């Protein structure tokens, strides 16, 4: 009996040792767009720059997406918006369509009238609270997106500001009231991460992702 117990422990410890650690990937590791493309597959050129780890949308360049697809992941990033600016990070995408972590100047952009369009909201679906810990325009915010199975979370500066489960009755109700309602399976696709060009200057840095 002891012999089999020892064999079991050796097997279990061997599997534990062989387990691969979760890899965190820097989506701008080389300080360039080698991991990115435009939505239409073209090379990222005018409109977007990256320098010293800071990604800047400064003029018309179109949305850009990762070459790799993701579904279950944790994404952390810093973001900074211009005065009266609008942008976002989309995930579980198809083309330019997908769930969106809204990036907005809540004070001066006209989209602030809709609570689900304000900063850190799950755009069109779940509003971030008015009491969220957002920085002044021009300062860096820390964002975090968790997409694991049906669980969706948005974080802002260390505080969870959005939480919903895909496919629940609450989700279905919000989805049917949104502009996405005709897109079957929306929110449950595997797809690239997208940085949105919404015609306003925006900055990102420290964009790190790990599959979970």
Residue ranges of predicted features:
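Sec-dependent N-terminal signal peptides
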Residues: 3-12
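Carbohydrate-interacting regions of secretory-pathway proteins
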Residues: 17-212
């Amino acid at each position: 009996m002891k012999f089999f117990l020892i064999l079991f422990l050796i097997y279990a410890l061997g599997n534990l040792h062989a387990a691969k650690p979760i890899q965190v990937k820097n989506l701008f590791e080389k300080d360039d767009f080698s991991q990115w493309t435009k939505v239409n597959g073209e090379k990222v050129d005018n409109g977007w720059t990256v320098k010293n780890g800071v990604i800047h949308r400064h003029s018309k360049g179109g949305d850009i997406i990762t070459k790799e697809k993701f579904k279950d992941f944790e994404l952390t990033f810093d973001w900074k918006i211009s005065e009266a600016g609008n942008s976002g990070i989309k995930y579980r995408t198809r083309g330019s369509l997908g769930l969106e972590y809204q990036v907005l100047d809540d004070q001066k952009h006209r989209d602030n009238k809709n609570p689900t369009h304000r900063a850190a909201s799950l755009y069109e679906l779940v509003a971030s609270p008015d009491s969220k810990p957002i920085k002044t325009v021009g300062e860096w915010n820390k964002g975090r997106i968790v997409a694991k199975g049906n669980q969706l979370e948005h974080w802002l500066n260390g505080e969870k500001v959005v939480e919903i489960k895909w496919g629940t009755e609450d989700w279905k109700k919000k989805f049917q009231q949104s502009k996405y309602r005709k897109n079957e399976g929306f929110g449950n696709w595997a797809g690239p991460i997208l940085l949105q060009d919404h015609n306003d200057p925006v900055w990102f840095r420290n964009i790190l992702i790990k599959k979970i």
